[in-house]
Amino acid sequence: MQQTNPSVQTLLSIGGGGANATTFAAMASQASTRASFINSSIQLARSYNFYGLDLDWEYPSTATEFTNLGLLLDEWRAAVVSEATSSGNTTLLLVAAFYYSSDYYGLTYPIQDISNSLDWVNVMAYDFIAPGWSPNVTGPPAALYNPTSQVSGDSGITAWIQAGVSASKLVLGLPFYGYAWTLVSADDNGIFAPANGAAISSDGSIAYSQILDFISQNSATTVYNSTFVTNYCYSGTTWIGYDDTNSTSTKVTYAKGTGLLGYFAWQIGQDPNFVLSEAGSYEFNHFFFL
């Protein structure tokens, strides 16, 4: 990618939703294993000319693990600074993907360590509702606002800022996918309609490209809800919550207006012809205050 687009700065990402959180916890629990992880990550990043490192530990689950996360970040920062000094290279960027809120089920992220050690935080403001944990009712998987609960992109960003992380270090996550439910009744097809589990796939997840195919092939009805800042579509008893160009653009405007560093998406391979990518990019580059 860098050979084709030299201006693109790639990061080496470690972890993800499918990674073993217990393995991360074990690594972070001791100074020796943290050092081994840190040193090997720096060596690997340099070997392949990455510009930085991205940690995606989903998720620490105890107060001790959150404390150890803070130690890991501090030691990682010290190590990349030391390596850059000795090698003469530019200091590697350090980034992490975190929960949508600074509060994780009553546990708090190590705010000071995050502020001191990371260049930015990718805030995963999605997967709020899905058939896997809400099989009986539809909902907006990545609502920017939610008048019915505190679970939303805006509430999460607000929590991070109020906890002490600068808005300029926060990056808003956008999903290029959605979730599909099976409606109990085709006639009851709005947000929070009664449902009977997942549709289309085993967990209901569906890429944006597949959503467009579903809409086209089934002449599905599409709706944009500005209260939640979400899209949904339905045909028969299949209901899909997702983000389209209008919700994506609104979220990018929000990110810019709130003073965030920017936005990221999971993931561009699900965006055919860069429809959502271009909508976000246009909004970010043409934003102005009224």
Predicted regions and their residues:
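Glycan-recognition patch characteristic of GH18 chitinases/ENGases
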Residues: 1-45, 278
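Mobile, glycine-rich extracellular loop/lid and propeptide segments
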Residues: 15, 52-60
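Substrate-binding surface in catalytic domains of secreted glycosidases
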Residues: 59-211
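Short, acidic/polar
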Residues: 28-49, 102-113, 153-158, 242-256
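Hydrophobic, secondary-structure "cap" segments at the distal end of domains
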Residues: 201-259
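Conserved, mostly hydrophobic/aromatic
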Residues: 12, 55, 76, 121, ...
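Acidic/aromatic/glycine-rich contiguous surface patches that form carbohydrate-binding/processing clefts
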Residues: 179-181, 243-290
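Receiver (REC) domain switch/active-site residues of two-component response regulators
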Residues: 51, 119, 261
